[in-house]
Structure formats: structure tokens, C-alpha cells
Amino acid sequence: MKTKLFFLSALLLAMQGVCGCGGDDDDKTTFQSRWSGCKNESYDTRSGNQLPWDEECVEYEAKDGGRLYLKHVNALFNCATENVEVITSVNGNHINIVEHAIGNMSANCICPSDVECLLSGLSKGKYSISIYRNMISDAHLQFSFSIDYDESLKGDFRK
């Protein structure tokens, strides 16, 4: 039994390594992602003003080497969320991002948090970006917007 549990655990860890950095035929991958955990306060990084906890936005900025930094500000998750796994796929000029909550989701509350990721392998051009939140088994579209990627790109998208 212990041997089966060990092999199952090893398989799950290997699958997380493969699936956690989604990619496609063009080898565009997320090579960094971060989840802030529940926040007590939220601030607009452009103005420094405090944001209401239910005001979500996506900040984005081009980085050198064909990279794109994305920050989903005030993403709402269950207070019992233990971590958020970011899964990406790039198909042509369409970028899909799934923010997958990990935990038992038993708390009767939600809290704002920030989810960040860094995509690589992009080239100059127009891209559509769709961000989905997956809290249990269903992924729900949160944001869908377009960018014109080049080395000077910097902005945000607000609902």
C-alpha cells in the first residue's frame, strides 16, 4: 500500500510539473507564476490609491526577450485556498490563462489576492488574452481583452 501511495504521489508531482507550465507547439510557456495569498488591503500600482477589494483588473507589461508580465489584481478566491496554479496555453495569437485554486474551498468567505505570471516566447503582434478562474471543477471566463505586443507595451485592462 505504501509503495502504491509513493508511486501515485510521484506521478502526481510529475504531472504537476508538466501541466503547471502549459505550452504549445510554439514553445511559449509560463516559466514563473506567483500567488499572493489573501490580502488585507489592495492598491492601484499606477496611482498608489487604495482599491475596493472587489475591483479586479489585469496589469500587463512587456519585458525584454519576448516576455510578457501579467498581474491579475484582486482576483477573488475562497478564503480556504491554499495555492493557485497558473496554467497557460498559447495557440497562434490567442493566450489562455487558467487560475486554478487548490484547497478544500470550505470557508464561507472570499478574499482578494494577486496572481502573477510571466510568459515567454512572444513576438511582436496582436494577441487576444482570456483569463479563466477555476475554483472547483468549472473554469469561468473572468477577462478577455487584446493587446498589441511590442517591447514598449505597458497598460491595464479593467472591467
Language-model regions, residue ranges each:
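Bacterial Sec-dependent N-terminal signal peptides
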Residues: 16-37
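A short tyrosine-centered beta-strand micro-motif
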Residues: 127-129
